């Protein structure tokens, strides 16, 4: 399990760079609300994360159902964190750090035990 989490974390670093880049562009370049910026960053980064983790972490085939399950769960998590950040007037950097930490742990657990549960 630790080896899987290490692989998931490695892909998560790349995913985080993608997410944070899009988030920064939306907040600072387009002046959007954090909820929209966080969700936009998520949408772009989640596809990379799903396919990379399916292939390199879980050695699994990708299916539309698995993709929809992963995107649905992680998208809801992203929107909730962004909405809460707006409600609390959190600085964007705190929002990014918070979402990155929550999504790493929750995403791994959800992927391992729900999305790719029949693998390995």
From Swiss-Prot:
The keyword Transmembrane applies. It holds the Pfam family GtrA_DPMS_TM. It is a multi-pass membrane protein. One of its GO terms (biological process) is polysaccharide biosynthetic process. It is found in: Host membrane. The chain crosses the membrane at residues 10-30, 34-54, 65-85, 90-110. Keywords: Host membrane, Membrane, Transmembrane, Transmembrane helix, Transport. Signal peptide: none annotated. InterPro entries: Glc_translocase_bactprenl-link, GtrA_CellWall_Glycosyl, GtrA_DPMS_TM. One of its GO terms (cellular component) is host cell membrane. The keyword Acyltransferase does not apply. Belongs to the GtrA family. Involved in O antigen modification. Involved in the translocation of bactoprenol-linked glucose across the cytoplasmic membrane. This is Bactoprenol-linked glucose translocase.
């Amino acid at each position: 399990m630790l080896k899987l989490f290490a692989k998931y974390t490695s892909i998560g670093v790349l995913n985080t760079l993608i997410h944070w880049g899009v988030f920064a562009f939306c907040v600072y370049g387009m002046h959007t609300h954090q909820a929209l910026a966080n969700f936009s960053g998520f949408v772009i980064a989640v596809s990379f994360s799903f396919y990379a983790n399916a292939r390199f972490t879980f050695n699994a085939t990708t299916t539309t159902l698995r993709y929809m399950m992963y995107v649905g769960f992680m998208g809801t998590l992203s929107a909730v964190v962004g909405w809460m950040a707006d409600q609390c007037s959190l600085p964007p950097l705190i929002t990014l750090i918070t979402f990155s930490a929550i999504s790493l742990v929750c995403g791994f657990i959800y992927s391992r035990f729900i999305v790719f549960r029949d693998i390995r």
